[in-house]
Amino acid sequence: MSIIYGHRGASAHAPENTLEAFALSMEMGADGFELDVHMSKDGELVVIHDETVDRTTDGTGFVRNLTLQQLKELDASASMEGFRNCRIPTLREVFTLVQDTDHIVNVEIKTDECDYPGIEEKCLALAKEMGVEDKVIYSSFNHHTLIKMRQLKPDVKLGMLFGDIMVKPWEYAKQLDVEYLHPMKMNIYVPDFAKDATAARYGINMWTINDKETISYCLEQNVGIITNYPDVAVALRAEKAK
């Protein structure tokens, strides 16, 4: 059965990567949600997609140049109608949401554009402290980060993110020692992609699947779905299960 993740939470319905979006994704029946982690100037793990705050808040500047206090003063509602005064959450705040649930958190570590020394260690230490290690899958476009995570914690769950249509990505994935492939959506239409990846013993979580046709196809292929519309994906999964 396909696992459904809210992409940056239920980001079609609430401001992306906010507690409001994550809580809504959970309410909609998603099995988990995906988020992005950067590090503030004072070393705090914060949840936001871009390297700057410009697009999703009323502020400007690089995340790495702002303290947590400065980040918390920003409105992260991105001018979405019906929302005001949403805040950039810390990863600690997000982990608190899932502590007593069965929800999965797909943490994308954003080291592909910025260097955040020690971010891998901090993510692992926080998950251990909060008792959510078994609920977390870590992914990154920086595959050196995945290698480092495996070295730090041999039993950590890892997903290899890639945006290209690769030839036999499961062969490359062996070098990284990951459990999951996290490909962009067009890979699902490569002949036998899901079949061959599954045969190679990899789980698949596809991004970002928003149209009903592709959601339905992913459900038929039994691959994980990362979507801005978890409500739509959950409804289609229930319909197909009848």
Q: Model-predicted segments: where are they?
A:
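Phosphate-group recognition and catalysis centered on beta-loop-alpha active-site segments
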Residues: 1-242
